[in-house]
Regions:
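Catalytic core of DAGKc-family lipid kinases
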Residues: 78-202
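Short amphipathic alpha-helical segments
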Residues: 16-18, 73-76, 99-101, 219-220
Length: 307
């Protein structure tokens, strides 16, 4: 039994249109299913947990973007972990998780991929905890510059306009220079198991990733995998503007040459601690919040998927 949960506003209505196509295909296949259209992230969480308890052997298929997937994963993880198999049909603007997991962005092809699988896969999730919140993520968590881009993009009418033209992944690029002006460098301490703390006095971008991509397909760390049991931390310092821009430009080019830059540091680990002395915007799978000065703990969790 498949239960589809659709965020009709994802991708500026793309999820709703995709569901129309998928439902038609399901009827043609005479495949037993049910569905639910969410009205908010809170509604999604409440419905998923309630339905999972009523129908424990159901496969839940999410139609939405990376943000919708984030809320579904946290509904499963909190307050107590549910034993749920999760499917996913990408209908957002960036779709970084879909790219990493090699899920087609064509709804009928994504459905065919899902139905062809006979057994679930166990994939890694990142888990984070601060003094006042905790959560899991399938893509990445960022402090500083990338979070600033996401914050500006999410509050920009241009994102919806680009989504209408199927150019949603370019929404982040359009807010790049505004974020560059707004974000300031900050002091950051990174603590890894069995290593002394590492201090950065001019941190500008700090991203913990579970897979290669962020920002709508930019390859941050090409070697990252969804099933390697590890998180990768990337820190870029901005000691001058030209140096930072050159590193970011290299990130957009093939070859991963940005990883050779002196201002970039990366670490692969199963858990870590970040400490800041100033408030920072944080983005998690494209959702943002303000992180007060303090400690941010991260480690690996896992979730069963089928796609």
């Amino acid at each position: 039994m498949y239960h589809f949960i659709i965020n009709p506003s994802a991708g500026n209505g793309r999820a709703q249109k995709s569901w129309t196509k998928i439902q038609k295909k399901l009827c043609q296949l005479n495949l037993k299913h049910s569905y639910y259209l969410t009205t908010s992230s809170t509604d999604l969480k409440q419905h998923l947990r309630q339905q999972a308890k009523l129908t424990p052997k159901t496969i839940f298929v999410i139609l939405g973007g990376d943000g919708t997937l984030y809320h579904a994963l946290n509904a499963i993880a909190f307050p107590t972990k549910l034993d749920v198999i999760l499917g996913y049909i990408p209908c957002g603007s960036g779709n970084d998780f879909a790219k990493a997991a090699q899920i087609s962005t064509d709804p009928n092809k994504a459905l065919a991929q899902l139905l062809a699988q006979k057994a679930p896969r166990t994939l890694d999730l990142g888990y984070f905890k601060t003094s006042d919140r905790a959560g899991v993520f399938s893509n990445n968590l960022g402090l500083g510059f990338d979070a600033q881009i996401v914050e500006i993009t999410n509050n920009s009418p241009l994102k919806n306009q680009l989504n209408k033209l199927h150019l949603g992944k370019f929404a982040y690029a359009t807010c790049f220079f505004k974020a560059l002006r707004r974000q300031k460098t900050f002091a950051l301490t990174v603590t890894l198991p069995n290593f002394p703390p590492k201090n950065f006095s001019h941190a500008f971008l700090c991203t913990i990733t579970d897979q290669p991509y962020f920002g709508g397909g930019v390859s941050l760390f090409p070697k990252a995998r969804l099933d390697d049991g590890k998180l990768t931390l990337v820190v870029i310092e901005k000691k001058n503007l030209l140096d930072f821009l050159s590193v970011f430009l290299l990130m957009l080019l093939p070859g991963a040459y940005h990883l050779l830059a002196r201002s970039l540091s990366f670490y692969t680990t199963t858990k870590l601690k970040l400490t800041t002395t100033t408030p920072q915007i944080v983005q998690v799978n494209g959702e943002t919040f303000t992180f007060p000065p303090g400690e941010l703990l991260l480690e690996i969790k896992q979730q069963k998927f089928i796609f």
